[in-house]
């Protein structure tokens, strides 16, 4: 049974091509092998995730605190329950903190997970323990699309 569980853990997020996944539990070896798209946010409480992640196609980065970004762009600093809308799906290279917190909040709503509740209650302690896993080619493609849109806007003016 334990070997079976380890195998299940090992295959998580292999060959991921899109979407968003949040991992609150342990990962197995070779996480992200063949991951060409999408984003994974992994809770790395013990700081050992990098040793289990296949870094051939992905980069790991921290989930930054975004209060200043949200305040300057949307006037929503410190307010995750704001009444206005921020389209966090419009730019997958930004808004990580808000996106992650929203997903965990939905997880809590639908599952009553004790861990999700603890993470949200102690957000300032848990946020720095999350890593964003993003394929390098996916990031490059998103940056090219963003630059092209910006060029089209400038050209239209």
Residue ranges: model-predicted function:
Residues 1-13:
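Single conserved hydrophobic/aromatic residue that forms the stacking wall/gate
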Residues 29, 36-157:
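Intrinsically disordered, low-complexity terminal regions
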Residues 8, 15, 24-26, 43:
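Feature marks extracellular polysaccharide-active and adherence modules
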Residues 1-3, 18-22, 109-111:
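A short linear-motif detector with a strong N-terminal bias
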Residues 16-21, 34-40:
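Short "repeat-start/strand-capping" segments in structured domains, especially the N-termini
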Residues 12-13, 30-33:
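Tandem-repeat/low-complexity and Cys-motif detector
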């Amino acid at each position: 049974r334990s070997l079976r569980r380890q195998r299940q853990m090992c295959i998580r997020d292999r060959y991921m091509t899109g979407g968003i996944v949040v991992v609150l539990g342990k990962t197995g070896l070779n996480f992200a092998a063949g991951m060409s798209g999408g984003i994974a946010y992994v809770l790395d409480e013990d700081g050992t995730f990098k040793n289990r992640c296949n870094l051939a196609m992905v980069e790991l980065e921290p989930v930054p605190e975004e209060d200043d970004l949200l305040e300057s762009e949307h006037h929503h600093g410190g307010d995750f329950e704001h009444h206005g809308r921020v389209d966090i799906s419009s730019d997958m290279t930004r808004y990580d903190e808000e996106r992650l917190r929203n997903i965990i909040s939905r997880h809590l709503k639908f599952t009553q997970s004790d861990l999700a509740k603890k993470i949200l209650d102690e957000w300032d302690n848990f946020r720095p323990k999350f890593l964003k896993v993003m394929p390098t080619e996916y990031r490059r493609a998103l940056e090219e699309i963003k630059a092209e849109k910006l060029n089209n806007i400038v050209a239209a003016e």
